Amino acid sequence: MRERARQSAHGSAIVNLASVAGLVGSQLDPLYSLTKGGVTLFTKSAALEFARKGYRIRVNSIHPGVIQTDMGDQTFVSRARNLATNDVDAVREMARKTHPIGRLGVPEDIAKGILYLASDDSAFMTGAGLVVDGGLTAQ
């Protein structure tokens, strides 16, 4: 990342994919929280370093909540096992209910956030984390 930053003459943006699990922790998957928390702090550190060195590169992160993807489905299966049930749909419904907005996220929700962070519309943002979680962490 540093080499690319040195080569950029006109400025650009880096968007790192983190997670709300890196902001609040997870009792069911602490290693996932550990790695996503690392991404969050790496983002802030890189943003500060690039700014200090005068690189015209903004570095931000995006923090999705629970998103309807293959990875999300695998998580529901794993959690169902941990709860000693085979009812994956019930686990998915429990996850949906934790989001005040009343639904799980879809990949397009995250894509729009990434587009914003990569665009000039966020030109005054660096070292920030955009939380796209349907209100999950607002509770």
Mark where each language-model region is.
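Residue(s) in the substrate-gating loop at a strand-loop-helix junction
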Residues: 19
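Active-site loop immediately N-terminal to the catalytic Tyr-X3-Lys motif
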Residues: 24-30, 102, 120
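Active-site helix of classical SDR
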Residues: 35, 43
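Alpha-helical segment proximal to the catalytic Tyr-Lys
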Residues: 48-52, 123
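Short, small/polar-rich loop/turn modules that mediate ligand/substrate recognition or access, typified
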Residues: 56-58, 125-127
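Conserved SDR Rossmann-fold cofactor-binding beta-strand/turn motif
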Residues: 58-68, 118, 131-133
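Conserved loop-to-helix N-cap of the C-terminal "lid" that shapes the substrate pocket in Rossmann-like
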Residues: 61, 88-92, 101-111, 135
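A glycine/serine/threonine-rich, flexible loop-to-helix segment
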Residues: 66-98
